[in-house]
């Protein structure tokens, strides 16, 4: 285990994959590379997994054939681990977690996210697929809040990724499976712990989504993450959590309590070193709230594109700006676009000295 953790840190890998019949594989800047060419056998993989686990994680893995946990090593830092069984054989994926919480400037995040971190109340959802950096961005937002305000921040995570020290705020971090039985059990008791800010590691069910909305409705600021590719998909996914009879009420609750959605992807840097965050920002202006209340999700992206002066931007606009700034290649900008044709056209307009036009819509962070 020591050698594996050391290799992850030395190569600055984001992930490590351990599976029977293949060499240990690292993901570095989004590209897979193997450590040697010697495939691992079943015993080697099983022994490696056991070496990373606490007694409780070993018991959970034996009972459920799945285990998610964190590794906290004094020399090699923190790792998020997911052990599983595939085709009857053990497997493990490790994700490296930076020891220090990066700030907004280091991450290249839009300035409006500082305003979102300091909101008094409401719901802020960070959206993205696995490995897109949304947990890191959320940790940066919480750290900014922690350093620039006073209050009580409670996080419920599975597992805890970034460890927050007490700065201006008191920070309580609870890990599912270690400090609490489940998200739902922890969230049912959270309001009794007098929080000002609540962070839910991931929304996976209707019940967890209801808790997030309830926290916002009762005057708290709630952050959470959700697996989706963009803001529109995230809204559709929230709708899919609930039966048809509840969906109108869900749209109403979202329209009243949602303050922002931030969707993120990580693209290869044009320099060949590292990756670049590309961020879509949806802010709850009066018009956005009206569309959400009516369930008119299909109208939201166009409005986002016309509201850039207020801090909103679509993925395609963010891709174009990253390309114009020399951060990503033209090929990657087009490949990752929601509308490749629109991005291709705007790149041509830029190269010919023209700019795409935007209209503004009033928005003020409360």
Language-model features and meaning:
Residues 1-366:
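Short, flexible helix-loop junctions that flank or precede catalytic/ligand sites
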